[in-house]
Amino acid sequence: MPRLRRVSRLLLAVGLAAGSATCGTDDLTRESPDGLRPDLAAGPPERLAITRQPPGSALDQEVWEPGRQPTVVVRDGAGVKVPGAVVTASIAGGGGSLQGSLTKTTNANGIAAFTDLGIAGAGTHTLRFSAGTAGVTSSSLVLNPLPPEAQTGKWDPPVPWDIVPLHLSLMPTGKLLGWGKYEPDGRMGMPRLWNPSAGPPTGASMIHADTMLFCAGHALMADGRLMVSGGHKDDDRGLDVTNIFDPVTESWIGGLPRMAKGRWYPTVTTLADGRLVTVAGRDTTSTVVLVPEIWEGGRWVELPGASLRLPYYPRQFLAPNGKVFYAGERVQARWLDVDAVTAKGRGRWSTSSSLVHLWPFNRDYGSAVMYDTGRILVVGGGGDLNWSTPDPRSSTPTATAETIDLNGSGPRWSATDQMHFPRRHLNATVLPDGKVLVTGGTSSGGFNTMAGAVRAAEAWDPETGRWTLLASNAVDRVYHSVSLLLPDGTVLHGASGDANVPNTAQRYPREPSHEVFRPPYLFRGTRPTVTGLSKTVVTWGERFNVSTPNAAQITRVRWIRLGSVTHAFDTNQRANTLAFSVGSGVVKVTVPNNSRRAPPGHYVLFLLNRNGVPSTGTIVQVR
């Protein structure tokens, strides 16, 4: 008799097989315990059971963790598991909108595993899972409203330093190297190396430097060392020294070749091949330095063909065409080709009537950031009537912002929304979710009017072009303030002052402290988790794997170059949105295809879900 039932079931299965086209090759080769292929043994779906319920509680719109995503088993009328059945999820009760991939196909064991569900709409809900005419309803799920911080972010209380860290760089080791002008007792300021995971920065290791690094330029080199160009001889007078900090030995490298000229307030930019170019500043006699110098072969080489007067700390970036793009603070933008040869020698600046900002006045002490490949946001600045070509309509800074796209045949300018506050001495920091955070600064005219200090942060969204007002910090941070993205996705905003009021013996208030801003995305549910990388040193065009249980939930991958910031400009910061594909438990990431888009060095890699919630960052080197 058992043999007869078995033959009957086989004949029935053969009849059903002609209409089945939903199972894969792997399913056709698997066998059930009684030796029958499950796709041939099963009839149409008639019974569904939830083998893992949705979470009992979650946040509104949260993408539920992989271990809390529902799974459903599908059986036919005889209790045989049905592979290849399409299961659809929907809201059964409580209203709201179900988000994520709403249909899943059962595997060879008849299991449909959902991967990225979430519900928009606070309250109590139930879900319905259906396959054919069969269905099952989940247990209740309570969705709690998002906290206010999911819209505004949140500031941690101020944390003291022994110095004012108005120069600050994130090292590939995860430590922060910072320095100011003075020690608390008035002596020459010495750098501090701080490990954020080891406690507060008070008492952080002092890394002795032989020269005063205040008002130098700096950028991270391709190998992760920090190049520091110039320094402070006196106000408006720069040093010709070169200092390189090694984060592995945690020491300065001595005996390096000097520059041809001293530099006070220069900008250092890392090029596509790892060379560095330093421009602008004032020399030991307070004369404006016209000729750039390039660091190559372990020494500085002048570029006399590129002689040009530029403002302090020029806002410039390596562009996708391999040249350096000068984006301000002056109205006229320019290109620098370090390898061109002219009648005056090596190097050449070029410009045209079309390379002009939309805002027709100088943005002194405004900020700029490359928020994605070849795309720059220029924001704020101006307001000092003692500065050249001030805005005659106003003695206050501007709230305007504009974008520059360097990806085409020529730069393209576009106007974007204005900030909620005019600002100078602001900092612009690119975030993992693609937005740009602006912190600090003053809204009043004059060089550094403390009465106009702005504590409210705001964020610009490149997808909408709009600014969102965020939470306010506790301390006024204006001239000499800094902001820096940390690998955990928070932003350190610190320093201010530690300098003399121009043309007086008075000093601005010192702020030897920092505050940490936790952006809104950190209050929108559980973060994706990274469990490992196939490699942490990659090259251009290469693919590498990021292991994560959240692979099916990842909608965006970005990396952001380690920051090195001072005087309202992060010379090292730039971001790329990376191509990727998803496998089982893995995200396969593709590195940009050339070093003009992603210059050699270290980046913090983030995986993001559809709500813009990032993983904790992982530092990756491209070379």
Describe the residue ranges of each PLM region:
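Exposed beta-strand face motif in extracellular beta-rich ectodomains
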Residues: G123-L127, G601-Y603
